[in-house]
Amino acid sequence: MAKITGNLVATGLKFGIVTARFNDFINDKLLSGAIDTLVRHGAYENDIDTAWVPGAFEIPLVAKKMANSGKYDAVICLGTVIRGSTTHYDYVCNEAAKGIGAVALETGVPVIFGVLTTENIEQAIERAGTKAGNKGSECALGAIEIVNVLKAI
């Protein structure tokens, strides 16, 4: 029985990153964590393109455009949605998650879900480089690994 695994070497790989501007004080940290991790694992900065969109709801469309371009081995999607007092949070979270997942399945390109969906600002800050780590960095590791798993199949 063969065991297929992916290594964490990003040398020679190209990445697209889509980041939401809404809650940019959090998303800037997620983006920095993702880029730092990709570079530490061998990616060159000129092999990483970033696109900014208004909010998490708009991420899937740009992710699909990047995935369909043929330029990228993986696309990383970063954003932050913080629950408010209305149901808007639920709609944005659900549609962003569905859309990002659909892009990966439709294109065959790894598309990583790095949209924080938190109950409050404190949880978002914790996941952007403080006590709960940096989810942007974790998404970058996931992107590298899944690209290499697919190459090994």
From Swiss-Prot:
Any GO BP: riboflavin biosynthetic process
Enzyme active site: 88 (proton donor)
Enzyme class: transferase
E.C. designation(s): 2.5.1.78
Keywords: Riboflavin biosynthesis, Transferase
Catalytic function, reaction form: (2S)-2-hydroxy-3-oxobutyl phosphate + 5-amino-6-(D-ribitylamino)uracil = 6,7-dimethyl-8-(1-D-ribityl)lumazine + phosphate + 2 H2O + H(+)
Superkingdom classification of source: Bacteria
Described purpose of this protein according to its UniProt entry: Catalyzes the formation of 6,7-dimethyl-8-ribityllumazine by condensation of 5-amino-6-(D-ribitylamino)uracil with 3,4-dihydroxy-2-butanone 4-phosphate. This is the penultimate step in the biosynthesis of riboflavin.
Family: Belongs to the DMRL synthase family.
Descriptive protein name: 6,7-dimethyl-8-ribityllumazine synthase
Protein species of origin: Actinobacillus pleuropneumoniae
